[in-house]
Amino acid sequence: MGLGLVDCHCHLSASDFDNDLDDVLEKARKANVMALVAVAEHAGEFERIMQLSERYNGFVLPCLGVHPVQELSPEKPRSVTLKDLDVALPIIEKYKDRLLAIGEVGLDFTPRYAGTDEEKEEQRQVLIRQVQLAKRLNVPLNVHSRSAGRPTISLLREQGAEQVLLHAFDGRPSVAMEGVRAGYYFSIPPSIVRSGQKQKLVKQLPLSSICLETDSPALGPEKLTRNEPCNISIAAEFIAQVKGISVEEVREVTTRNAFRLFPKLQSLLQKELQSHPLQAKSAQGSAGESKGLL
């Protein structure tokens, strides 16, 4: 078995995991997951994510950011405001040295969330400020772009963002290729098994631009069923099927891509990398060895 998989985008602070997170993470370890990139959506989650990163040190890796849709109550999701960002920034500054990336950030032009030009423009301003923050901290961006693929990629390029992961991209492959040309990565969730759009996307994306994610508890292989990080192998297997290559190649290359995207991840696991270079055709490590370092 290879060095291990990296779940590049998941929501471990979600209430769905309140009662059994230990079990969920143990299942992930047994599924050869070596690292979980935990993203935030609003300031109210930040402390919880940092606590999880301490409790599962070297396994749960924290990202803090302000999402374009603020679901502070399930009944009233709304478009983000600059005030939301102002609340979040001091907490991000507090933890800046411990962050793997800034995220989840981005644009969401779904009409029910951003029905006016003013709301879309405020989303852009919130994203621009977080791009500037990520550049100052020299960390990547973990990006949401629902119903806003082209505007998101255009803004990121205009702002000079270089380290970017576009998670669960829902746009056309031709638009995604603009991101590929900018050096951006695209993470693919297990829901690819039921998404013709994701399958077309993967068919066109070069493997060198693909990472794996689960977006747990969302975007699982079955609709309306809680997704978990252990399902990441489902995404890897389906990508292999779509591209007509071995699942071993998908696992190896997507993990290597994750290390390129997240430099701090490479630093964290430097000893493992020295023992089992990701560039090698066949990694010699085992799941047990990976766990021992985490």
Swiss-Prot record:
Description of how activity is regulated? The 3'-exonuclease activity is sensitive to the metal ion present in the active site, whereas the AP endodeoxyribonuclease activity is observed in a variety of divalent metal cofactors. 3'-exoxonuclease activity is suppressed in the presence of Ca(2+), Zn(2+) and Ni(2+).
Query: Which amino acids does the record list as binding Zn(2+) 1?
Result: H9, H11, E104, D215
Q: Which Gene3D superfamilies match?
A: Metal-dependent hydrolases
Q: Does the keyword Nuclease apply?
A: yes
Claim: Nuclease is one of the keywords in the record: yes
The cofactor remark states:
Binds 2 Zn(2+) per subunit. Exhibits AP endonuclease and 3'-exonuclease activities in the presence of Mg(2+) and Mn(2+). In contrast, in the presence of Ca(2+), shows AP endonuclease activity exclusively.
Q: What class of enzyme is it?
A: hydrolase
Q: EC number(s) on record? A: 3.1.21.-
Location comes to: Nucleus
Q: Name one GO cellular component term.
A: mitochondrion
Which cofactors does the annotated protein need, by name?
Answer: Mn(2+); Ca(2+); Mg(2+); Zn(2+)
| Recorded family membership | Belongs to the metallo-dependent hydrolases superfamily. TatD-type hydrolase family.
Question: What function does this protein fulfil?
Answer: Exhibits 3'-exonuclease activities and apurinic/apyrimidinic (AP) endonuclease (in vitro). Show preferential AP endonuclease activity on double-stranded DNA substrates and 3'- exonuclease activity on single-stranded DNA.
Q: What is this protein called?
A: Putative deoxyribonuclease TATDN3
